[in-house]
Amino acid sequence: DCGYNDPDDLFLIGESGGFLLNIQPGDKFVNTHLFTEAADFYRKNKQYTFYKVDSIPHRQFRKREEYRRRHGFTAPCLLRNGVVQDVRITGGMYNYLNYTMIEQLDTTTAKATLKASTGKKKYDFPKFIDAQFWTWHVMEFAVNNGFHLIIDKTRRGGFSYIMASDTANELNLNSRKVAIHVAADKKYLTATGGLTDFTINNLRFYETKTPFVRGLLTTNA
């Protein structure tokens, strides 16, 4: 209503003129497996589709998934006032949930005592987290309205995975795209577990495991 690009009506303007998240009391996300059907299929079958490469159904699948990675995906996953409603995740979040592998705790191995907690790690697709739903929408809102964005984040909260996924998604979807990563020390970018390292891993995943092969990945200087 105030001239901002907010198609999902997720933002309010506060008394100070700043933006607030339009979170309604009692809202709850449900049926979130509908957001991750591509990831679930890959986890089960070790591939995203059974269609023959470059067949018409394969091309249609690729175009559909590229559209979702760019524009987002809507599904009946929001419970509000006792009624399940459609809600959209952003294209970046759709890509993150379905085409990004991250290191995470294998909950089947978790053990806790009064003194310590232990568990093994595994690589898998991210789980849907409601806080990240808002993170991705804030990022999209900033881009769509020409704003700069500073995120005050916690350490070890998965933001490097999120930003690397976003970078890789933009580079894979768009030709002649440039992404710049900056850090106080380059080891936070290029060393194993750094932002750029994660991004390269994501680009390699596109090239080797998905229908989105572009043949452009090289790490040669």
Task: Specify the residue positions occupied by each region the protein language model found.
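Phosphate/NTP-binding elements of NTP-utilizing enzymes
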Residues: 1-221
